[in-house]
Amino acid sequence: MKDDFAEEEEVQSFGYKRFGIQEGTQCTKCKNNWALKFSIILLYVLCALLTITVAILGYKVVEKMDTVTDGMETSRQTYDNKLIAVESDLKKLGDQTGKKALSTNSELSTFRSDILDLRQQLQEITEKTSKNKDMLEKLQANGDSLVDRQSQLKETLQNNSFLITTVNKTLQAYNGYVTNLQQDTSVLQGNLQSQMYSQNVVIMNLNNLNLTQVQQRNLITNLQRSVDDTSLAIQQIKNDFQNLQQVFLQAKKDTDWLKEKVQSLQTLAANNSALAKANNDTLEDMNNQLSSFTGQMDNITTISQANEQSMKDLQDLHKDTENRTAVKFSQLEERFQVFETDIVNIINNISYTAHHLRTLTSNLNDVRTTCTDTLTRHTDDLTSLNNTLVNIRLDSISLRMQQDMMRSRLDTEVANLSVVMEEMKLVDSKHGQLIKNFTILQGPPGPRGPKGDRGSQGPPGPTGNKGQKGEKGEPGPPGPAGERGTIGPVGPPGERGSKGSKGSQGPKGSRGSPGKPGPQGPSGDPGPPGPPGKDGLPGPQGPPGFQGLQGTVGEPGVPGPRGLPGLPGVPGMPGPKGPPGPPGPSGAMEPLALQNEPTPASEVNGCPPHWKNFTDKCYYFSVEKEIFEDAKLFCEDKSSHLVFINSREEQQWIKKQTMGRESHWIGLTDSEQESEWKWLDGTPVDYKNWKAGQPDNWGSGHGPGEDCAGLIYAGQWNDFQCDEINNFICEKEREAVPSSIL
């Protein structure tokens, strides 16, 4: 500004020779005084405006020439023409001051408007450049973020590849596990077959033991019968002995009577004495026979005692074998249950791993698709950014070239203006010398001229003092959401909020994969003893019995007269060994009779063929599979019904019968009223053996829920949809068995 004021002071000493003011007489000076003043003021104003505009243009153009657009070329040409016209007008102002005052004013106004337009264009260019800078910064930030994202994507892809390799390794390991499990299952099947074979052998041994026990019981009954027969024979012998004693007494009486009549019966005395001797011999024989019978009785008692002891030993052995077999069966059942739980766990683990692998593959496919989409988008963005960067580089190169051209032209224009200013200073000095010779007389005031045009808006004044703080305005509308910033550090845990209101019940989800089975529960109490089994196969032939004691040999009697034929004598001593005789008859007949006895038919237990008996009921375990209604009709055709399980013992027996088989229908349903389970005859359920989490009435999103119950692999109850196909169990009352069959 100081330079501008100095230039104005220098301009005030202008000369006016070039503008048509010539020296003359004093009168002409007076006449032309007003015109000279007006022309001088006009020249000062024009020069000041020109210097100000040139200085402002130079300052603005030098400051903001980096962001000049293509439209500056046309404006520059017009400005060059206008500057040339201004120079020519300045050169011709001395001759054409009066004529072209209005034209200069109009040109100045147009020049001002052009300068304002140029300022606006420069402001727009600066705004565009600032926007372009912001866009460049944003593009650079986006490029950096894209680079970071690409690195993150590479890391995620590496992690995914590592996960895929680990999944493949785990799959290989699971394949090894599956092969090992298959081998284990084959080994288990072999063990099961061996256990079944050993179980069959044990059953055969038990049947043989039962047969031997039955034979021993029959032998004991026969021995008891023989003992009873011997006791009867002894009673008969005692009765005979008493009769003989009575006879002997009668004989004594007769002898007394005969002694009285000895004289008359002397002929008969010899006979009577012979008869007495014979009677004495018979009595001695009877005494000997009684002693032999007592020895035989002693032998029989010893044999019976030995048999009783052997029976007791056999019963103890039988009880021990039964206990051992029961313990073995319980151990086998526990092992079977453990094997079943292990197999179920393995199946559940395999299903869980398969489900997990499916989810992993789906997630990997989703990640792959998202990665491909993001990569394609990023490649498109990068191509667009590269194109925009190329365009920006070309624009910047063209702007720099235009800036260089404008600088060179400004330098030339400033040089021309400096030359013009030097010439004007010289003219001003000359005019000052000429003005010293002028005598200016003040003439009468002229008429008031017309109102001039409104001047241009002045520069803004200095900023005033800061005013008082105004009232707080209304909150403005929320601005657009900014870009998402980086994730900040994790803040401290907030206070626990109040308990929210209970939400509405959501829809029932899909049926999940079977959970892992729980630990094995404690063994239950031993059940009551079962009913007696069927008669087994006949056992082997028993050993021969003990040999009886040999009787005592009687003394030879005195030969008497030949009497009546007496009783058979006691067997004598064994004679010498003779030649071998023909083969004798076979051994004891009772075991043979037992061996040849036919096995009882299946109707002996009161159940038809292919039906099994338990307590007073008969059960049919189907081989075919039907839906619930068809199974119910099948049982009704057999004059029975689907099984009703009303006790723990019945449940355990049915569990043993269905071990290792598929699911079976039972006569339990809630089709009449949901969640109210009843047997088919309408009776409520007293005993329950539902699986954990059942019944769940799972509908799987189609049709009705699960309204029919059945047994699963572990013997527990589960609800099924009634249109599923399963095996079934029929139940009916056992028919009365005739006593003749028993």
Curated annotation (Swiss-Prot):
Start and end residues of each C-type lectin domain: 614-731
Biased composition (Pro residues): 516-532, 571-585
Subcellular location: Membrane
Binding sites annotated in the UniProt record for Ca(2+) 2: D670, E674, N697, E706, D707
Keyword Disulfide bond: yes
Positions on the Extracellular side per record topology: 59-742
Protein's UniProt keywords contain Disulfide bond: yes
Coiled-coil region list: 104-142, 220-301
UniProt-listed Gene3D superfamilies: Mannose-Binding Protein A, subunit A
Region of interest (Disordered), ranges: 439-608
Compositionally skewed regions (Low complexity) per UniProt: 501-514, 534-556
Positions with a binding annotation for a carbohydrate: K691, Q694, D696, E706, N718, D719
Disulfide bond sites: C607-C618, C635-C730, C708-C722
Subunit structure: The extracellular domain forms a stable trimer. The extracellular domain interacts with fibrillar amyloid-beta peptide.
Alphabetized GO MF terms: carbohydrate binding; low-density lipoprotein particle binding; metal ion binding; pattern recognition receptor activity; scavenger receptor activity; signaling receptor activity
Organism: Rattus norvegicus (Rat)
Membrane topology: Single-pass type II membrane protein
Chief place where the protein resides: membrane
Binding positions for Ca(2+) 3 per the UniProt entry: Q694, D696, E706, N718, D719
Cytoplasmic side: 1-37
UniProt KW keywords: Calcium, Coiled coil, Collagen, Disulfide bond, Glycoprotein, Lectin, Membrane, Metal-binding, Receptor, Repeat, Signal-anchor, Transmembrane, Transmembrane helix
Protein name: Collectin-12
Domain Collagen-like: 452-511, 527-586
